[in-house]
Structure formats: C-alpha cells, structure tokens
C-alpha cells in the first residue's frame, strides 16, 4: 500500500505509522528522519539542507522532493510506503504525483488523522518538551490548518478520515478497518 498520512502535530501519525509499517510490511518514510539521515550521512542533499538549516532558513521544496524521490526509489519501497510529513502543500502534492508517475505507480489513499485541538494540546503538553507551551502548540496547529487546508481539497477523492482520539490500539483498529475496506 502506498499511503500519505496527514494530521496535525500530536495526532499520532508517527505512532500509527510505526505500527502500520510493521503490520503492512512497508517502510515508514518520515521527512524528519530523511533530513536527519541525509545530514548524518553527509550526502549532497544533506549538506544542502544543512546549509539552509544552519542559516535559520526553510529548506527549499526541491531539496525535500529530491530526498523523498531518492527514498521512494529504494527497493524496500517498491511494494508500498507510508509517507509522513510530505506533502505539506499542494505544490508538494504535485511533486509527489510526478515522483510516483516516474516510478509507474500511484497513491492508494491519504489517511487523515482527525483529532480535536484540545486533545492535541493535552497530548503535546504531556510529552513534557520544554518548547511545547500551549501557546506554541496552538500556533503550530494554526500553521498546520492554514498550510494543509488546500491539500485536503487537493486529495479530497483519496482521503480516508480516521478518528485519532482514544487509545493507540483503538486508533490502529479503526485505521486497519479502513484499509481493509479499501482493499476489498
């Protein structure tokens, strides 16, 4: 299965992706991990990304797209993947379509993890990170909503909504049921 996971920070995408990766036997491709790997391995793309990060600038979409393209071209992603953190914009959605066209494949679905703002704030405050104040979290949620709203419209025919509240197990059960329905 080739899936994109969408949802606000704190929706549990990473947690669900790890479980789904195990159950479906496909890699969890997180853009955060891709950045860390490329920078850590001192690849050409990693060096380019690091130069922007060190200067306090956003890494250009082209660099992220190339990292994703490289990763999705690897053998373990041939039968599927779970994309987490990409795409974030309609422009990146178009880029992903181009990557997949080049690989002769397409997305099976976009999983949108729906969770209330209050639950996200509660979860993120519980993590106990110093930079996770309620104000910072609510700002991140607003940025997510503003950035991602057009993407939800872009993928409207592919979206499967998952209620991402309750236990990790309950959310995973709902996700697996939705994917089984997609497969039948």
UniProtKB/Swiss-Prot annotation:
Positions contributing to AMP binding: 31, 36, 57-59, 85-88, 92, 129, 140
Chief localization: cytoplasm
The name this protein goes by in its record: Adenylate kinase
Coiled coil: none
PROSITE patterns: ADENYLATE_KINASE (PS00113)
Residues that coordinate or bind ATP: 10-15, 127, 166
Record keyword Lipid metabolism present: no
Entry-linked InterPro entries: Adenylat/UMP-CMP_kin, Adenylat_kinase_CS, P-loop_NTPase
Record-listed E.C. numbers: 2.7.4.3
Region of interest (LID), residue spans: 126-132
Gene3D superfamilies per record: P-loop containing nucleotide triphosphate hydrolases
Pathway: Purine metabolism; AMP biosynthesis via salvage pathway; AMP from ADP: step 1/1
UniProt keyword terms in alphabetical order: ATP-binding, Cytoplasm, Kinase, Nucleotide biosynthesis, Nucleotide-binding, Transferase
Assembly and interaction partners: Monomer.
Gene Ontology annotations for the cellular component aspect, listed alphabetically: cytoplasm
Family, as annotated: Belongs to the adenylate kinase family.
Gene that encodes it: adk
Pfam families: ADK
Biological processes annotated in GO: AMP salvage
Enzyme class: transferase
SUPFAM superfamilies: P-loop containing nucleoside triphosphate hydrolases
Reaction(s) catalysed (UniProt annotation): AMP + ATP = 2 ADP
Entry note about domains: Consists of three domains, a large central CORE domain and two small peripheral domains, NMPbind and LID, which undergo movements during catalysis. The LID domain closes over the site of phosphoryl transfer upon ATP binding. Assembling and dissambling the active center during each catalytic cycle provides an effective means to prevent ATP hydrolysis.
The keyword Kinase appears for this protein: yes
Species in which this protein is naturally found: Corynebacterium kroppenstedtii (strain DSM 44385 / JCM 11950 / CIP 105744 / CCUG 35717)
Subcellular location: Cytoplasm
Role according to the record: Catalyzes the reversible transfer of the terminal phosphate group between ATP and AMP. Plays an important role in cellular energy homeostasis and in adenine nucleotide metabolism.
Region ranges (NMP): 30-59
């Amino acid at each position: 299965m080739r899936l994109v996971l969408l949802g606000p920070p704190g929706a549990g995408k990473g947690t669900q992706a790890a479980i789904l990766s195990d159950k479906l036997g496909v890699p969890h491709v997180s853009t955060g991990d891709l950045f860390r790997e490329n920078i850590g391995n001192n690849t050409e793309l990693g060096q380019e990304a690091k130069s922007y990060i060190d200067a306090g600038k956003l890494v250009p979409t082209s660099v992220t797209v190339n990292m994703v393209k490289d990763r999705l071209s690897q053998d373990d992603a041939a039968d599927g993947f779970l994309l987490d953190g990409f795409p974030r914009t309609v422009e990146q959605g178009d880029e992903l379509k181009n990557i997949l066209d080049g690989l002769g494949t397409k997305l099976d679905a976009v999983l949108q993890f729906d969770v209330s703002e209050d639950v996200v704030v509660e979860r993120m405050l519980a993590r106990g990170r110093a930079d996770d104040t309620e104000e910072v979290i609510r700002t991140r949620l607003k940025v997510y909503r503003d950035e991602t709203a057009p993407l939800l419209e872009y993928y409207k025919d592919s979206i499967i909504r998952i209620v991402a509240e309750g236990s990790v197990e309950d959310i995973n059960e709902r996700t697996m049921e939705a994917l089984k329905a997609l497969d039948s």
